[in-house]
């Protein structure tokens, strides 16, 4: 059956993705190798060899695990062993908060090392949020050349405006529009670090007493009261 599928895919010019999911590996298969990452890599290569023998060379590989250190190590290992395109993902990552962190660490680490060709963020959530997290990972690594880069500070004793509320409202407003090139928006809380960060952004605010300075592409446009900063 595998040979028939491989031959049909080859004739139609359709690639096949080999997916090794840690949750589907049998106990006796783990025991054949020195480590779980090694097992995942070798099992994928065994399947790739089977497809190659059947005449299919258009192959992509994914090695997914909910244990992020194993996932990272498995992809590093497979990258050493073959030149097949790699599809990155962390399986069973969980709900939005923890799952986003897992995906960002696992996928982001590998992409930063130059490993990986496509990605899939998995969350127990709306698929739209999966896409949003994936876009942010690519954006943070400079691999996506459109969308918003949003900068805001953690607040400190110098903050004199309700920065948290302002930052949340700005982020919500930005979600309604996606620019075709990277644009940076900075919402900063004080007059010490704020002006520099705000001036470096395409659009920035540096908070002060009862309001803030507005910068557009490094140019100071004026001081506005806190109630008008969002507008």
Task: Describe the function of each predicted region.
Residues 18, 61, 110, 153, ...:
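Conserved, mostly hydrophobic/aromatic
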Residues 1-33, 39:
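Active-site-proximal beta-alpha core segment in soluble small-molecule metabolic enzymes
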């Amino acid at each position: 059956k595998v040979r028939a599928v491989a031959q049909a895919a080859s004739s139609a010019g359709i690639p096949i993705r080999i997916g090794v999911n840690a949750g589907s590996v049998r106990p006796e298969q783990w025991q054949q190798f020195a480590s779980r990452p090694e097992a995942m890599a070798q099992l994928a290569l065994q399947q790739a060899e089977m497809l190659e023998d059947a005449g299919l060379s258009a192959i992509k590989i994914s090695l997914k695990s909910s244990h992020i250190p194993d996932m990272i190590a498995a992809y590093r290992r497979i990258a050493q062993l073959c030149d097949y395109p790699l599809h990155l993902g962390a399986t069973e990552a969980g709900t939005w908060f923890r799952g986003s962190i897992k995906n960002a660490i696992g996928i982001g680490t590998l992409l930063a090392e130059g490993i990986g060709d496509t990605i899939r963020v998995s969350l127990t959530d709306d698929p739209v949020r999966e896409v949003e997290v994936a876009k942010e990972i690519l954006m943070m690594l400079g691999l996506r050349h459109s969308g918003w880069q949003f900068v805001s500070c953690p607040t400190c004793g110098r903050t004199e405006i309700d920065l948290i509320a302002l930052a949340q409202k700005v982020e919500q407003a930005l979600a309604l529009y996606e620019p075709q090139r990277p644009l940076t928006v900075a919402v900063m809380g004080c007059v010490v670090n704020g002006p520099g960060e705000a001036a470096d952004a395409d659009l920035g605010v540096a908070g002060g007493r009862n309001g803030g300075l507005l910068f557009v592409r490094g140019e100071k446009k004026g001081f506005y009261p806190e109630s008008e900063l969002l507008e």
